[in-house]
Curated annotation (Swiss-Prot):
This is S-adenosylmethionine decarboxylase proenzyme. Pfam families: AdoMet_dc. Pathway: Amine and polyamine biosynthesis; S-adenosylmethioninamine biosynthesis; S-adenosylmethioninamine from S-adenosyl-L-methionine: step 1/1. The modification Pyruvic acid (Ser) is found at S113.
Length: 264
């Protein structure tokens, strides 16, 4: 086993794992599209997202400092959790009756170690396709690794397409004063995915090793139309319509996966 790096002082590396997770569906009528948005908005409201992120904090071995969450009108939700490596014992200033910290102070902590999630439901105005995007950032400063949350987060959502970015910034010093710009071995985010996840997704990497920047895109391999239909579409589509909807959905998924508009 490789020996641990002996550091001089605190580990100052910032490690950030960013997800964009997409769930795609088809609904035949405008009413069903709106019903899907309403359903997904209730399914992943701020309370549910808070529970998911709280589980992430436990998985990566961190401690919660503060939670802020909000549901939005007409749809969408956000949650931000400030975290630390060690449990925080309240100081006298925190217990006594006195003015709280200024917003700038709180934001300074937010830039160090935090977990955020935002949701974005969206509807295609013509094709009957709805997308639900979840944007998640797990950013830690110190020895805590956000990579531990990778598999859990992918499996918590109906993830048809996933884009993952991981970057390490800053540096830490060893006891001899030598700078270290990364403190662990990695050549791909895929190394940290479970076997079942790797088997379920088509994946491609774009990595810039010298910049400690890693990017993986994931597209679900198996396509079962029934998993993408919502409302009346589950009962009323003819065989020909099912073929057309399948083509539309696959086209939509490829455009999101490659991040570009593609000819039909």
């Amino acid at each position: 086993m490789k020996s641990k790096l002996k550091l001089h002082g605190f580990n100052n590396l910032t490690k950030t794992l960013s997800f964009n997770i997409y769930d795609i569906c088809y609904a035949e009528t405008p009413e069903d599209l709106q019903a899907y948005v309403q359903y997904i908005d209730e399914e992943y409201d701020a309370e549910r997202l808070t529970q998911i992120l709280t589980d992430v904090v436990d998985i990566i071995g961190a401690n919660i400092l503060n939670i802020a969450r909000q549901d939005y009108d007409p749809q969408g939700a956000s949650v931000t959790i400030l975290i630390s490596e060690q449990p925080v014992t309240p100081t006298d200033s925190q217990i006594e009756e006195s003015p709280g910290p200024l917003p700038d102070t709180i934001l300074a902590h937010l830039d160090k170690s935090h977990i955020t999630v935002h949701t974005y439901p969206e509807i295609h105005p013509v094709d009957g396709i709805a997308t639900f995007r979840v944007d998640i950032d797990v950013s830690t400063c110190g020895v805590i690794s956000p990579l531990k949350a990778l598999n859990y987060l992918i499996h918590q959502f109906d993830s048809d397409i996933v884009t993952v970015d991981y970057r390490v910034r800053g540096f830490t010093r060893d006891i001899e004063g030598r700078k270290h710009f990364i403190d662990h071995e990695i050549n791909s985010i895929q190394n940290y995915l479970s076997d079942d996840t790797r088997e379920a997704y088509q994946m491609t990497d774009v990595n810039v090793y010298q910049e400690n920047l890693f990017h993986t895109k994931m597209l679900l391999k198996d396509f079962e139309l029934e998993n993408y239909l919502f409302g009346d579409a589950t009962r009323t589509l003819s065989a020909e319509q099912r073929e057309q909807v399948t083509e539309r959905l696959k086209h939509e998924m490829l455009e999101i996966f490659y991040a570009r508009n593609m000819p039909r």
